Amino acid sequence: WESTGIKTLHDLKGKKVYVGPGGGGAGTDIEEIIELVTGMKPGDYESFKAPWGEGMGMMRNGQVDAMVRIAPVGAAVIQEFGLSKPIRFLQIEGDDLTKLDLYLKVPGRSISQIPAGTYEGQTNGDAVNTLSFVAGMGIHAGISDDVAYTLTKAFWDNIDEIKASASLAFGL
């Protein structure tokens, strides 16, 4: 929230931060990013891991000071926060971007931007640098061509329903 005064990852020291679900890669990646940029590890800030929906509830209810959420730019799951009170996205710039060089060498990781005014209630006056990731799907190489075709056809025949229920499919 804008009211927390948190503007960069450096401001997370001593704060309660929701980083994603336990047991998944998101929370681990987020903790790694915070450490690369700031040198802080969990303990320097209070790291919370829970399912995405629960984490969003923690943010809504003020149980955490900051939240990191994987979602495409413009996603409704983020917009809902801006509809209730002013929100700020944490900027990563200058030397902090350079600290992520090694992290960004992994294929599928890059820097992207959230333009100013993307979300109702967004207080950032300028575009905000953010991390972006490529997501993909695959199947076992031993699956028959017929089954692979059936799965692919079912996916694309139902793409509108998939987009409506899964924010990560937003850009498909």
Where are these regions (language model features)?
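Bilobed "Venus flytrap"/periplasmic-binding protein-like clamshell domains
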Residues: 2-61, 160
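Extracytoplasmic
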Residues: 14, 42, 84-87, 132-134
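Second-shell loop/turn segments in exported
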Residues: 16-22, 134-142, 172
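Short, charged, surface-exposed secondary-structure boundary motifs
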Residues: 29, 77-79, 98-104
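Short helices/loops that flank or line small-molecule/ion binding pockets
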Residues: 53-67, 79-85
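Paired acidic/hydrophobic, glycine-rich loop segments that form the ligand-binding mouth/hinge
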Residues: 65-70, 90
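C-terminal lobe and pocket-closing loops
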Residues: 88-150, 154-156
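Periplasmic-binding protein-like
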Residues: 155-171
